[in-house]
Amino acid sequence: MEDGARLILRSSAALREKEKVLVLVDRDTKPMGDAFLAAARSLGTDPVMICILPREHDAEEPPELVATAMESADLILLATRKSLTHTHARRQANRAGARVISMPGITA
């Protein structure tokens, strides 16, 4: 899994050393988050992973504390069961300059 995560970080995200990386997961997708965390570390970053309670439906906002963290990241990996793509938190993070890769429903 880590090799696949590293490929995504290099090719799709164009991850650069020392960027601030946030990996957002829920309990169902934590194993994938662990792979992205390890891959990001191997590429010279000090990533942070936050595990939230699974959302009830797509586009449900994450907790306010998570939204604040998203605004300060360079790259956000949304590896959650439900989609966070169409949330205010994601839009605000993009406006603040973050790149976002959304992978709702990702499995190992």
Segment roles from a protein language model:
Residues M1-A108:
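Active-site bordering "gate/hinge" segments
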